[in-house]
Amino acid sequence: MIIVVTGPSGCGKSTLIRRVQNGLDGLSFSVSHTTRPPRGSEVQGREYYFVSENRFRRMAAAGRFVEWAVVHGHLYGTSAKELRDKGRSGDVVMDIDVQGARQIRRKFPEAVLIFVMPPVFGELKKRLEGRKEDGPEVIAARLERAREEIRDCGRFDYIVINDDLERASQDLISVIRGQRCRRDRQETAVRSILKSFGRSGRPSIRKKG
């Protein structure tokens, strides 16, 4: 299962994903490529694969990304190899921007798309300023982009409002657990159980409607 967590810059999606990974087994993080320089304690291959613009564009031209976009002047993308490799060990969670999420929906219609929202606009502004990573002009650009992205929230499968980190992380965990219990994702397990009852074949579970 592919789980896409997206939302405006500063909404807290990266922090939420880290907490969810600590609370759930069988969940791998898809590491994106980017041309932006590392920030603070970021490590190559952990938060991102940091590459030159030349290398990124060569990869894009070769069709090696399942999604990529220009975000605040830098290139970001998810390689098909990364998604494939991480998917072998279970479910994969992606931390990508709204443009990338739309691309994933087109290529993988079964993906679960979750939009993380700040409680109010003022809180988002406060978080961006509190990071002390960008100047006023960059923050203003991020906030303007956030206004546009928020208007698209209705296109996503789930919305998590990050007004309280603990509650929001539990909401995200609940979404993933619920998706894992869908009958189409339980078919293999159900078939095995049916065999123990002396039955075989596909489970006869009626579809709605």
Describe the residue ranges of each PLM region.
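ATP-dependent small-molecule kinase phosphotransfer cores
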Residues: 34-92, 99-102
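Short hydrophobic/aromatic beta-strand immediately N-terminal to the Walker A/P-loop
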Residues: 2-4
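NTP-dependent small-molecule kinase module
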Residues: 133-134, 151-209
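Conserved phosphate-donor/acceptor-positioning beta-strand/loop module used by diverse small-molecule
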Residues: 93-97, 106-130, 161-162
